């Protein structure tokens, strides 16, 4: 084999490299939070949501989804059924996140050779990395009039001596998506029987 010379600096860390990262945090994150992880990130450049109803929506990065998009929780791989079946919801709750990172390009190789689409890292402090001074808490409630969705989120965290603790909970309830008036497919109208049309005349559109 021919000799190969590799030259690099001694003290460069992964954080020092140029990474194509989108970061959602603070007020921007609170404004963008949706019912699912995919809906939360849908406004980011190059990201869409593979929606299977009000409660299921996985992020799609540059057309890649499922196991080609690595979902992390605090930098640790999150294994759930959503990686192999898009009609399952991610086990991560975006309403509990303090920030969400979306990583694309060659930098995704840092997280394994399967993340060719990208990486979504959700930081929610469920595993505390430092001691909390005193006790902190958060309580938030959201309502969606389209699906009559109600979401309540609460967390409490603190420390006792050298032990950090964190408790959180989420309650979510959603109904069908409803619209005012009617939603009729013109193609189906040609094949609909008269009795069905009479029933539709007094019904409200439901998706």
Locate the predicted segments by residue:
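Outer-membrane beta-barrel channels and translocator barrels
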Residues: 34, 66, 160-163
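N-terminal periplasmic accessory domains that precede
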Residues: 37-40, 57-60, 69-72, 87-92, ...
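Extracytoplasmic beta-strand/coil segments of soluble accessory domains associated
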Residues: 38-80, 98
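Transmembrane beta-barrel outer-membrane domains
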Residues: 52-54, 90, 113, 144-149, ...
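Structural signature of outer-membrane beta-barrel domains
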Residues: 11-13, 66, 78, 125, ...
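Short, acidic, small-residue-rich periplasmic hinge/interaction motif at the N-terminus
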Residues: 1-30, 38, 66, 124
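Short acidic/polar hinge/loop motifs at secondary-structure boundaries
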Residues: 77-106
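Periplasmic-side early beta-strands and strand-to-turn transitions of outer-membrane beta-barrels
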Residues: 134-140, 144, 151, 155-207
